[in-house]
A protein has these predicted regions:
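Feature captures hydrophobic
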Residues: 1-123
Length: 123
Protein backbone atom coordinates (compact mmCIF):
# COMPACT_ATOMS: atom_id res chain seq x y z
CA UNK A 1 0.00 0.00 0.00
CA UNK A 2 1.50 3.31 -1.06
CA UNK A 3 -0.42 5.63 1.25
CA UNK A 4 1.39 7.17 4.19
CA UNK A 5 0.49 6.46 7.81
CA UNK A 6 -1.16 9.86 8.39
CA UNK A 7 -3.60 9.21 5.53
CA UNK A 8 -4.32 5.69 6.78
CA UNK A 9 -4.97 6.95 10.32
CA UNK A 10 -7.38 9.54 8.93
CA UNK A 11 -9.19 6.86 6.87
CA UNK A 12 -9.46 4.52 9.88
CA UNK A 13 -10.70 7.28 12.21
CA UNK A 14 -13.35 8.43 9.72
CA UNK A 15 -14.54 4.84 9.21
CA UNK A 16 -14.95 4.30 12.97
CA UNK A 17 -16.74 7.64 13.41
CA UNK A 18 -19.07 6.88 10.48
CA UNK A 19 -19.96 3.57 12.09
CA UNK A 20 -20.30 5.03 15.62
CA UNK A 21 -21.56 8.62 15.09
CA UNK A 22 -22.02 9.20 18.83
CA UNK A 23 -18.20 9.49 19.11
CA UNK A 24 -18.01 12.39 16.61
CA UNK A 25 -18.42 15.24 19.15
CA UNK A 26 -15.87 13.73 21.57
CA UNK A 27 -12.94 16.08 22.24
CA UNK A 28 -9.93 13.85 22.69
CA UNK A 29 -6.25 13.50 21.80
CA UNK A 30 -5.15 9.97 20.89
CA UNK A 31 -1.52 8.92 20.62
CA UNK A 32 -0.88 6.19 18.05
CA UNK A 33 2.31 4.11 18.09
CA UNK A 34 2.95 2.01 15.00
CA UNK A 35 5.79 -0.49 15.49
CA UNK A 36 7.72 -1.84 12.55
CA UNK A 37 11.19 -2.93 11.47
CA UNK A 38 13.05 -1.77 14.54
CA UNK A 39 11.43 1.63 14.92
CA UNK A 40 8.21 3.14 16.20
CA UNK A 41 6.30 5.86 14.39
CA UNK A 42 4.31 8.09 16.73
CA UNK A 43 1.25 10.05 15.68
CA UNK A 44 -1.19 12.42 17.32
CA UNK A 45 -4.89 12.27 16.39
CA UNK A 46 -6.92 15.20 17.65
CA UNK A 47 -10.68 14.82 17.71
CA UNK A 48 -13.28 16.00 16.77
CA UNK A 49 -11.54 17.76 13.85
CA UNK A 50 -9.49 14.64 12.95
CA UNK A 51 -6.16 16.43 12.78
CA UNK A 52 -3.39 13.81 12.31
CA UNK A 53 0.25 14.80 12.89
CA UNK A 54 3.52 12.97 13.30
CA UNK A 55 4.11 13.82 16.95
CA UNK A 56 4.76 12.17 20.32
CA UNK A 57 1.31 13.27 21.60
CA UNK A 58 2.41 13.96 25.16
CA UNK A 59 -1.10 15.31 25.90
CA UNK A 60 -2.84 12.11 24.72
CA UNK A 61 -5.61 10.75 26.95
CA UNK A 62 -5.56 7.41 25.11
CA UNK A 63 -2.64 5.64 23.46
CA UNK A 64 -3.05 2.95 20.80
CA UNK A 65 -0.21 0.56 19.93
CA UNK A 66 0.04 -2.00 17.12
CA UNK A 67 2.32 -3.31 14.40
CA UNK A 68 2.48 -1.10 11.32
CA UNK A 69 1.84 -4.05 8.95
CA UNK A 70 -1.24 -5.06 10.95
CA UNK A 71 -2.61 -1.50 10.90
CA UNK A 72 -2.04 -1.23 7.13
CA UNK A 73 -3.84 -4.54 6.54
CA UNK A 74 -6.80 -3.51 8.72
CA UNK A 75 -7.27 -0.22 6.85
CA UNK A 76 -6.65 -1.83 3.45
CA UNK A 77 -9.41 -4.38 4.14
CA UNK A 78 -11.87 -1.69 5.33
CA UNK A 79 -11.91 -2.90 8.94
CA UNK A 80 -15.13 -2.25 10.82
CA UNK A 81 -15.54 -1.61 14.54
CA UNK A 82 -16.13 -5.34 15.15
CA UNK A 83 -12.79 -6.11 13.46
CA UNK A 84 -10.99 -3.58 15.66
CA UNK A 85 -12.68 -5.06 18.75
CA UNK A 86 -11.32 -8.50 17.79
CA UNK A 87 -7.85 -7.02 17.32
CA UNK A 88 -7.91 -5.59 20.85
CA UNK A 89 -9.32 -8.81 22.34
CA UNK A 90 -6.67 -11.00 20.67
CA UNK A 91 -3.76 -8.67 21.48
CA UNK A 92 -2.96 -7.44 17.96
CA UNK A 93 -3.70 -3.90 19.16
CA UNK A 94 -3.43 -2.39 22.62
CA UNK A 95 -5.16 0.63 24.15
CA UNK A 96 -4.08 2.35 27.35
CA UNK A 97 -5.05 5.61 28.95
CA UNK A 98 -7.50 7.42 31.18
CA UNK A 99 -9.98 4.82 32.44
CA UNK A 100 -13.02 7.13 32.14
CA UNK A 101 -12.35 7.77 28.44
CA UNK A 102 -11.72 4.08 27.79
CA UNK A 103 -14.98 3.08 29.52
CA UNK A 104 -16.93 5.82 27.74
CA UNK A 105 -15.73 4.70 24.30
CA UNK A 106 -16.43 1.02 25.06
CA UNK A 107 -19.96 1.85 26.29
CA UNK A 108 -20.77 4.04 23.27
CA UNK A 109 -19.48 1.39 20.84
CA UNK A 110 -21.42 -1.39 22.60
CA UNK A 111 -24.64 0.65 22.50
CA UNK A 112 -24.17 1.35 18.79
CA UNK A 113 -23.55 -2.33 18.07
CA UNK A 114 -26.71 -3.22 20.03
CA UNK A 115 -28.70 -0.67 18.01
CA UNK A 116 -27.36 -2.18 14.80
CA UNK A 117 -28.32 -5.69 15.95
CA UNK A 118 -31.88 -4.68 16.88
CA UNK A 119 -32.25 -2.77 13.61
CA UNK A 120 -31.24 -5.90 11.66
CA UNK A 121 -33.61 -8.07 13.73
CA UNK A 122 -36.60 -5.86 12.88
CA UNK A 123 -36.04 -6.09 9.12
Amino acid sequence: MSEDAKTLIDIAARAVLDEVPALKPLTLVVGIDLHGRGDTQQFRLQMPELDVRKDIAADARIRLEMRREFFNAMVEHDARVADWREAFIHGHAKATGVEQYMRLIVNVVERQEERNRTRKARH
